[in-house]
Amino acid sequence: MNQRIQLSDHFTTSRILRFAASPIIMMVFTSIYSVVDGFFVSNFAGKQAFAAVNLIMPFLQAFGCIGFMLGTGGSALVAMTLGTGNKKRANELFSMLVCATAVLGVIFTVVALLVLRPAAVLLGATAELLDDCILYGTIITVFQTAFMLQFLFQSFFITAEKPKLGLFFTVAAGLTNMVLDFVFVGVMGLGITGAAAATVISQLIGGIGPMFYFARPGNGGLLHFVRPVFSGKALLKACTNGSSELMTNLSASLVGALYNWQLLRLGGADGVAAYGVIMYVSFFFAAIFIGYAQGCAPVVSYHYGADNTDELKNLLRISLRVIAVGGVAMLCFSELLAAPLSRFFVGYDAELLELTTLGMKLYSLSFLLCGFNIFGSAFFTALNNGIVSAVISFLRTLVFQVTAILVLPHLLGMNGIWLSVVAAEIAALFVNAFFLVKNRKKYQY
């Protein structure tokens, strides 16, 4: 019998996997339509346009991650409030966070448009790439608010016990992006203009569509819009809770720029294009872990708010086993599929194909460990300990990766760039283990 799973339930391995299935599929599908986007740009607009898109992408993602921060941090706060039994307050907090995200989205859009050109130059855009960077970046930036709201609602659908509805909006947005990529880029030959247009239309579906659902008080979920009651303390708490996710995404943008700089220095535009392919593929594999962590987080927050320590122990134990098995499976799959996946993107250029395949095989070693580090950070966010979560993310995604990217290429050349993420994940695993052991008595997991 397929009964509805609730946050208050006792979770077995199969039950938590069922509950996390929708956010996992949601994240995987998001990565798939990003891959399709890259495929059409690379194969129909050329590797120069593909390199330009990947060069400006870190800047665009840096602004969009505000929605991810408020979504993950805010959903942890709202889920904990639901766990205490105060549903009215939970809806007030939810409504306030949506309004705050929309306002911040408008502000950041204006700022991003003003600094887009100097940012592209700073990221290393050459004269050949600059115009394409500006064109793609401008179209995406104008609709940045929808992008932020899309990330926000992905987290809150899980908290509202409506993960399948969140999946529906993600699939609808993704299919729209894929179809429009085919029409705009493949058929009409609009190049990166068409790719950008396809992306923003899909973001409008994913970011604006959920508002119609949450506007209905009797929507069947735990959350709906009410008159927002502003609370600076609650907003700060949500930001603190989600600071690790903000740090992860900001660091990813900075590290991505640093990767591109090193790759331009050692491999030229081909190096940047190869990195773009590896990022698309790695996001697909990492999305499984991210989706699982997103699915578990509201459950952890709820039971933490309800002071159910036995269930916290159970959730942590199950999750570590699931991640260990998943890491081994992903490593095997990524090594086996490195060549065919590289050929899918850059099969038209033999030299670029060889570079991409080797880079992907080395980079894929990180999949064995990254799941533990992704979950560890999300676990502390769910416990409303944003500081520990942020420290883990800061060290993992910024300090360790930046150090590795700056040092390893001098020792190993181009291979050192691909192995930088592996070194960072190994170091982060020790940090994660330290904090899990250190805080065990405090949270009684």
Write out the residue ranges for each language-model feature.
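Small-residue-rich hydrophobic transmembrane alpha-helices
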Residues: F50-V110, F147-G166, A274-A338, C370-I392
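Membrane-water interface regions at transmembrane-helix termini and the short interhelical loops
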Residues: F153-E161, D181-T193
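Helix-terminus/linker motif at the lipid-water interface of multi-pass membrane proteins
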Residues: I32-F50, A120-A127, V183-L190, L246, ...
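Alpha-helical transmembrane segments of multi-pass membrane transport proteins
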Residues: S14, F29-T30, G67-F68, F108, ...
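Transmembrane helical elements of multi-pass membrane transporters/channels
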Residues: R18-D37, I139, A173, S202-G206, ...
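Hydrophobic transmembrane alpha-helices of multi-pass small-molecule transporters
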Residues: A62-C65, T109, N177-F182, G207-M211, ...
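Short runs within selected transmembrane alpha-helices of multi-pass transporters and secretion channels
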Residues: G71, I139-I158, G166-N177, A195-P210, ...
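Short alpha-helical transmembrane segments in multi-pass integral membrane proteins
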Residues: M1-P23, V78-T145, V187-S243, V300-S366, ...
